[in-house]
């Protein structure tokens, strides 16, 4: 099966100088992939010429005359720029010409245009950005990571339902554990939105284990962590900054003297493994969950290496049938939520997440 993806080549901080090289490298490594490069034709052609890929049959240029800037208001992207690379890329997915869209564009604009063009699954009011964060035994699903800055309690419940469905579909778990990100485990902690969301989660049939704190994110305390997009995005980017700082400190300390440089040579295999594990670029590419089609959001500041990972998320999601499995799990879960008995879930308790051993698929991964 040929996997057909649209690439919003003009999105992100760097546009075609990042997206096109990433696309070229990806198709050279994945012969069953066909990428539609959407954007300003002359800009895309210039990059393809540099890479000697103008005649690559796995790459098709799809012209678009407008660009959604990173600081464009949502209404501009939605109502005025109807021939933007973002809109055209999403239209191709809607029309069935492609199976997923990958964009590093403006998060708010991407969510709004995606909702308008592709529509949401039944019972979902707002899509959410879901990302698989590594933990000692695998990955913890976390959402929302930037699509919704302000959320109502029922939105957080819907995010939990989507996270439950995704983990159930991908990991085969009947009852994934759910945690609500808060400033403390106690039910009295948090603002009114969080308290009400906790009540809704405890009244649902989801396997809700109560509140979790920021230090639980990388422990694997629960399978799914739910939060609003403001909190999630800050937590994610704080993690990225910390990982970068640790790498810089280690590099600086090993470079201080001749002796430390010799020690670095001896420790090189360990250092390389450490660098690979904390390199956030390999986790780039987060699914916009809740839509009727696949959309992968790349970090806006991604370089070519990171954007190639975002393409891989979309490719893997299509290959693994993630959208179909998620839709089935959501439908099954809606039945259980309607017919099931009350399950308070034990607020404030935690149990280890288990079974996360595979590399995160496209629907599981990163950045807003």
From Swiss-Prot:
Say if the entry is tagged with keyword Nucleotide-binding: no
Write down the chemical reaction(s) this protein catalyses.
a fatty acyl-[ACP] + phosphate = an acyl phosphate + holo-[ACP]
Which EC number applies? Answer: 2.3.1.274
Region annotation (Disordered) ranges:
337-368
- Keyword terms of this UniProt record: Cytoplasm, Lipid biosynthesis, Lipid metabolism, Phospholipid biosynthesis, Phospholipid metabolism, Transferase
Membrane spanning stretches: none
One Pfam family from the record? FA_synthesis
Name any Gene Ontology BP term.
phospholipid biosynthetic process
Q: Where is it mainly found?
A: cytoplasm
- What are the protein's GO molecular function terms? phosphate:acyl-[acyl carrier protein] acyltransferase activity
Task: Tell me a GO cellular component.
Answer: cytoplasm
Give each disulfide bond as a residue pair: none
Q: Which Gene3D superfamilies match?
A: Isopropylmalate Dehydrogenase (3.40.718.10)
User: Origin, by domain of life?
Assistant: Bacteria
Q: Where in the cell is it found?
A: Cytoplasm
Q: In which pathway does it act?
A: Lipid metabolism; phospholipid metabolism
Q: What does this protein do?
A: Catalyzes the reversible formation of acyl-phosphate (acyl-PO(4)) from acyl-[acyl-carrier-protein] (acyl-ACP). This enzyme utilizes acyl-ACP as fatty acyl donor, but not acyl-CoA.
Q: Which family does it belong to?
A: Belongs to the PlsX family.
Q: How does it assemble?
A: Homodimer. Probably interacts with PlsY.
Q: What is this protein called?
A: Phosphate acyltransferase
Organism of this sequence: Burkholderia cenocepacia (strain HI2424)
- Highest classification ranks of the organism: Bacteria, Pseudomonadati, Pseudomonadota, Betaproteobacteria, Burkholderiales
Which gene holds the coding sequence for this protein? plsX
């Amino acid at each position: 099966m040929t996997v057909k993806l649209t690439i919003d080549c003009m999105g992100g901080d760097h546009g075609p100088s990042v997206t096109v090289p990433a696309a070229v490298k990806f198709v050279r490594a994945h012969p069953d992939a066909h990428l539609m490069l959407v954007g300003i034709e002359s800009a895309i052609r210039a990059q393809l010429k540099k890479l000697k890929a103008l005649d690559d049959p796995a790459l098709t240029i799809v012209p678009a005359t407008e660009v959604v800037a990173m600081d464009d208001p949502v209404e501009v992207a939605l109502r005025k720029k109807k021939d933007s690379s973002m809109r055209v890329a999403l239209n191709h997915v809607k029309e069935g010409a492609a199976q997923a869209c990958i964009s590093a564009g403006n998060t708010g604009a991407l969510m709004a245009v995606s909702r308008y063009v592709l529509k949401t699954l039944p019972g979902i009011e707002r899509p959410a950005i879901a990302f698989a964060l590594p933990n000692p035994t695998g990955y913890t699903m976390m959402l929302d990571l930037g699509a919704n800055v302000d959320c109502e309690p029922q939105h957080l419940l819907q995010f939990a339902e989507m996270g439950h469905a995704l983990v159930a579909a991908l990991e085969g778990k009947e009852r994934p554990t759910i945690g609500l990100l808060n400033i403390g485990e106690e039910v009295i902690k948090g603002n009114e939105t969080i308290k009400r969301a906790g009540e809704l989660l405890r009244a649902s049939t989801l396997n809700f284990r109560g509140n979790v704190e920021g230090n639980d994110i990388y422990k694997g305390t629960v399978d799914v962590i739910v939060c609003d997009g403001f909190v999630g995005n800050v937590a994610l980017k704080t993690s990225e900054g910390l990982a970068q700082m640790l790498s810089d400190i280690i590099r600086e300390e090993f470079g201080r003297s001749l002796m430390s440089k010799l020690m670095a040579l001896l420790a090189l295999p360990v250092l390389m493994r450490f660098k690979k594990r904390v390199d956030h670029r390999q986790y780039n590419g987060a699914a916009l969950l809740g839509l009727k089609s696949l959309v992968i959001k790349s970090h806006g500041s991604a370089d070519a290496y990171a954007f190639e990972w975002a393409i891989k998320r979309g490719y893997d999601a299509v290959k693994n049938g993630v959208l179909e499995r998620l839709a089935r799990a959501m439908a099954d879960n809606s039945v259980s939520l309607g017919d099931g008995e009350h399950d308070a879930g034990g607020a404030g308790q935690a149990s280890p997440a288990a079974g996360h051993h595979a590399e995160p698929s496209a629907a599981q991964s990163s950045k807003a």
